[in-house]
């Protein structure tokens, strides 16, 4: 089929009128006789619309006439068959039998074969409106078609008395009616044909738009349209319609890449005020001319009413909305330039799609806005008359038909552009043998590396690790999702992609094959390295392991959903080697949302386990939100619960038979935590709606759940910010209470117990224990063996109870001479310069009982044998007792200074005191409640050398 152009459309429409006039002239004498006979017939039935079915055209033969008949009955349109009605087609007078509409002796006839053939001949009309054989199956399309034509002819019949017209034989009025009928036929045929030539339509619009874009300023736009060839007074109605179609090109002005958003908005307003204004002038003049011909008023007030009504019908907001679409296209195009350099042109495809569909939308918006303005003018003109103006044929009915066809055509145009996107993607995938959307994620990751490279290459220094492994989950990308939806390839997209990058000595390893990351099977292997230290950092939340599959399903007529199916793996297995590694699992998504309440809170979730085999080396593991199984292997390994709100710990190792084995129970209470949820991405391509299910991490409020971790070969546990409970084993345990009010019981063994922040209760139990209360008012018990207590400024008021052994109390950051010693009741209070007290309970109880009870024998040693300052200086329990007694229950500053000076002059003890000073200093710098990290770091300061320092303390 030949392409439709603006000029050919005008020519065709003009020819329609010309044919009408020629036929009228050619009729000659026949016209006089025919019109007289027809006039008599029309007296009884001129105001009927008839669906005419000729003899032999049977609806049972597989055509769509049966559906048209049903629709006609629904709409009250009479149905006649030739053999029943004996209709006399006025072939000799009007020769309209090859058109959809025609005059007959009983009224206006809608020819069923011609309408049926039109639908068959135009398959794209058939696809949108419904084919001739299935038209009734799609929301009553036959009703829509017949109803639209009936509306047009209803306007004709209300504005023209055909009986009177034919009887009076007024050639001017007859020409007008005939022109209207011909125009309707031509418009239906030509616009229907344009659906098959979408590219031609767009091409002609684009050509005219390119001319307009070269005009300086916007003021010349109306002149350009005014310079179109004049079709003459008799065809002014055609000029209006042609102006509407050509005026659609003004939408391209809004797409000018050189124009600012403000200029585009101004272009919309300018177009509304000037271009449509000129069309309105033509409409108004035509309406007024017809009012004069009908003997109706054409005074100034009437003209003003028409003009004002037309103006109100024009909404610049329509053009502002179009401008926003072009703005979106411009933003995406600008965004796309970077990713094109990285091997992905999907964003450019998306920008082109929005620009092309925006142009289509702009054209339709322009036409519809102009039609609304004209219809408003017609309504104003008709308001003052009892009989509507004949221009209703050219406006009210025709505009409705144009609008309907354009709306149906717009979707076909959108899909045509979408098909081009689809073909480009398929072509690329065949050439590169790779998923196109995966390439999109790859480009996003490369851009992320470029943006953050300076930060990433500094991680070796910041994290004090020779090797840093950065694992990044590229999340769902809305623009990639839009592209998949537009191209109808939603089953080919994934929820994202995970990447591994390694950094050594401040250099990025472009592809580190030594790290294995297998998302489908849940494997992370970092064991293949010759570096001594490494840090594994999950930069963004890593989704749960498993393989995704998608299925695109049609939900409604124009609605599709792509369902997500996941073959899940219930755990990650992480393998480390000989390096001393720090691994933070708090950014690994371990909970999968299963059920929600009405407020969207998670009330049921599923667990994804982490199994970590750490191998040799001194490793640090930060535990995440759910079940974790850790085998520390060789070396001194620490497990941290200090990050995230993942529940208070309950550890009971009293029955453990293997050193370093612990069962850690956690109740993660009502709060927010990372969960994997299924979200839906929605994209509209005109009337087509696409929904895509995808996975994402969601920091969602949830109800509580219980987790049990299993630890093996773990030497040290750092608690949570909640109120933890620790019960040690028969072996040496190292516990850090972290924040919260913690209860820590070392049980047997030589334990290291750190209270952290909060008012903790610490009991060393049996063994030579190292006890640090931390900040808060702590209650500390050492037991009967040789214990070491540590206090520093800011730790608060601690209460210590001891019962035997050779014990030591170290003030890690205070000189001994700056402390105050007092006897309060039977206890000893030691006060620092900040006023914080360490109270040693019942220090003097045995002495007080001995002085008051005859023959009393001491049964328990409740004293601490040495109290040590930050420089290693110390005072013994015997010296404390003597000086307290001499100082009337308090040691004077002078007496305390003398003790310190005497100790410092002792040469044979200097080496030991220096070693002990290191012990105290290291303890002072070790803050168990700290997170030991910067915003992304995982560095944990080395804890004190437990065995060596205790030996030094004992030797001291």
Curated annotation (Swiss-Prot):
Hemolysin-type calcium-binding repeat residues: 718-735, 736-753, 754-771, 772-789, 792-809
GO CC terms of this entry: extracellular region; host cell plasma membrane; membrane
Post-translational modification note: Palmitoylated by ApxIIC. The toxin only becomes active when modified.
Gene3D superfamilies for the chain: Serralysin-like metalloprotease, C-terminal (2.150.10.10)
Any GO molecular function: channel activity
Domains: entry comment: The Gly-rich region is probably involved in binding calcium, which is required for target cell-binding or cytolytic activity.
This protein's name: RTX-II toxin determinant A
